[in-house]
Amino acid sequence: MDALDRLAEPGLDLLGRVDTLLAAGAPEGHRLWPLLRRMQVLPGAAVREFLDLHPAPLTGAGHAVRRLVRGYDDTCAMLADPVAWSGPAAGAYDEARAALLRHLDEGPESLVGRLESTAGYADALADWVEGSRLTLARALADVLRSAEAVTVHAATRAGADAGRLGAHAAAEIAVRVLGVLGVAYDGAETLLRQWAPSLAETTWREQATGPYRHGGTTRIGH
């Protein structure tokens, strides 16, 4: 359990009240409006969805992919073992073996290269989630102890008249929370742009080969 989990219950209670007030309309001309148009969600609902994001599954995914890399390394080691034979068939086999080795583990466009990039992307996303959760927790801590929180609680009591003060306080809290989430999602989009070239599907890289000769002698050494 991290700081965001600990603040989830009081934070969602406050933001639920904020959502209730904003559902009746945010103050005209308030700086919240651009955020609402961009995010298309009220702060309570946005935080509730974000709470489901945790770094551990992404970290675990990175470890799992790296275990696959070790399997590819073992396969490549077997393919690289010299074969004691010669002749046209041996030459054709060596060319096919070299092409397969290139496809499996030669450079960032190989299968191993793509797996390593996938693991790195999972790690980067895990760091993003961890950092974003901490930043959001700090924002929630700030709004929970703010004067606006007191106003929102008073405006949403049974029988209370929300009034302009309640709507303004709710909008101020929403700006802080949605602003943090907007920056967080910008970070996720930046990560995707940075990693996308390294995550593209790898394709078989043909190597030009000469014509095979048939009918020659194949010699197998001991």
Language-model segment annotations:
Residues 50-53, 57, 103:
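Short amphipathic alpha-helical segments at helix-loop
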